[in-house]
């Protein structure tokens, strides 16, 4: 398939132009005009670039891209990364906030579905846009039972043992913790822990799961990969390169 067609599909499906973002969302580096195989990863890095080349991908789609608000200087690490992509004829496509907020394949929608809750209200306002979701489980469920569905997490167990109202804001989502407390959320799920969240959660009487920044944001690219396979009929592969952060 032609690169322009793949990019057009992704731009439209993810509504790339609907977000004011620090990330330059969309096609960041142009490579091969023909796309036979697409790799998906959380982060743009030399490790993910090399892994994409190793599986003979023509395009790499990531959540955390290479270009954030423009490139000031093409030297050092930036120079080596761009040089590798161009020499490998490997296209790089990034979707940051669009892949957090998407109701079908977004990180937060997928997190909620994994625990048995359908995303309902938009939640977690960031730069004027809500990028997460809140939801209600069908019945009050033990916090430990929910944790088993998501895998290892750092837990602040400051709320009720059984919860029904939940919310998710992946990645560095502690900015929405106050919003969660004010909204009566009983379990708030995010990625990266922040020191200030401890006493805020304790005083707010809320349970908090910290899945890790990486782990909370691999769901979106994995779900988008399945859509690309189904809708475009292109071979696709997920490159799991955890940061343990």
From Swiss-Prot:
Residues that hold a divalent metal cation 2 according to the record: 64, 213, 217
Signal sequence bounds: none
Gene Ontology CC: cytoplasm
Keywords: Metal-binding
Residue positions binding a divalent metal cation 1: 63, 100, 217
Molecular-function GO term, any one: metal ion binding
Family, per entry: Belongs to the GTP cyclohydrolase I type 2/NIF3 family.
Subunit structure, interactors included: Homohexamer.
Record-linked PANTHER family: GTP CYCLOHYDROLASE 1 TYPE 2 HOMOLOG, NGG1 INTERACTING FACTOR 3
Protein name per the record: GTP cyclohydrolase 1 type 2 homolog
Organism this protein belongs to: Archaeoglobus fulgidus (strain ATCC 49558 / DSM 4304 / JCM 9628 / NBRC 100126 / VC-16)
């Amino acid at each position: 398939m032609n690169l322009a067609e793949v990019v057009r599909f992704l731009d439209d499906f993810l509504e790339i132009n609907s977000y004011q973002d620090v990330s330059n969302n969309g096609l960041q580096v142009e490579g091969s005009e023909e796309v036979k195989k697409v790799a998906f990863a959380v982060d743009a890095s030399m490790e993910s670039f090399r892994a994409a080349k190793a599986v003979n991908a023509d395009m790499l789609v990531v959540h955390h891209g290479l270009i954030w608000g423009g490139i000031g200087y093409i030297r050092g690490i930036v120079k080596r990364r761009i040089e590798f992509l161009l020499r490998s004829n490997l296209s790089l496509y990034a979707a940051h906030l669009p892949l957090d907020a998407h109701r079908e394949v977004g990180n937060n929608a997928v997190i909620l579905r994994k625990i048995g809750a359908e995303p309902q209200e938009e939640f977690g306002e960031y730069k004027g846009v809500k990028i997460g979701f809140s939801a209600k489980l069908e019945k009050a469920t033990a916090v430990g039972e929910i944790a088993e569905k998501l895998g290892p997490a750092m837990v602040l167990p400051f709320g009720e043992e059984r919860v029904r109202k939940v919310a998710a804001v992946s990645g560095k989502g502690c900015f929405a913790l106050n919003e969660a407390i004010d909204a009566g959320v009983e379990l708030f799920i995010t990625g990266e822990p922040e020191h200030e969240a401890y006493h805020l959660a304790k005083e707010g009487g809320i349970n908090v799961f910290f899945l890790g920044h990486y782990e909370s944001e691999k769901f979106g690219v994995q779900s988008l990969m399945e859509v690309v396979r189904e809708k475009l009929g292109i071979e696709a592969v997920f490159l799991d390169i955890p940061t343990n952060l």
